[in-house]
Amino acid sequence: TGAILGFVGGRNYQENQNNHAFDTKRSPASTTKPLLAYGIAIDQGLMGSETILSNYPTNFANGNPIMYANSKGTGMMTLGEALNYSWNIPAYWTYRMLREKGVDVKGYMEKMGYEIPEYGIESLPMGGGIEVTVAQHTNGYQTLANNGVYHQKHVISKIESSDGKITVSYTHLTLPT
């Protein structure tokens, strides 16, 4: 439904009144891989969990190696393995393939509530060039849990006066991605 049932905005309100769940943006790092690369490729019918992907050493266009911890790559693996171990190189190749095939990655991400300023960043599927709030990123992930249907996040479902009259009622926004 998109309803937020509870959240923690910070550990000590007396020291910091910033609501970190809704207001603080951070790099989502590798947690973008299922949304920005693999989920879209699967939805487009281009890949499945057993699709074999390259995890051989690869460099970005500027010559810097694409790394995973201390490893530059290991060989071939399935998409499921790449996702399970969060390998960077298969995510890079998947995202690159989506762009080369002209898949509307921006459209997918916007339907899940993401505002990404630049889609040409090679490290984007590893979280480079994107910052999100916890609430925004959680809302993107609920789209996966809801079989590709986006439900806009909301905290208040209705406001009711003391006499029982509903003064505000939330209307659910659902969009297929």
Listing of model-derived features with the role each one plays in the protein:
Residues 100-116:
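Short, charged, amphipathic alpha-helices and their helix-cap/turn boundaries
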Residues 11-14, 59-60, 88-90, 131-132:
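Solvent-exposed loop/turn segments at secondary-structure junctions
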Residues 5-7, 93-94, 125:
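Structural recognition of the beta-strand scaffold that forms the well-ordered cores
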Residues 2, 27-53, 82, 140-144:
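Active-site SXXK
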Residues 14-15, 42-51, 115-117, 146-151:
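Secondary-structure transition/capping motifs at alpha-helix termini
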Residues 114-166:
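Active-site-proximal helix/loop microenvironment
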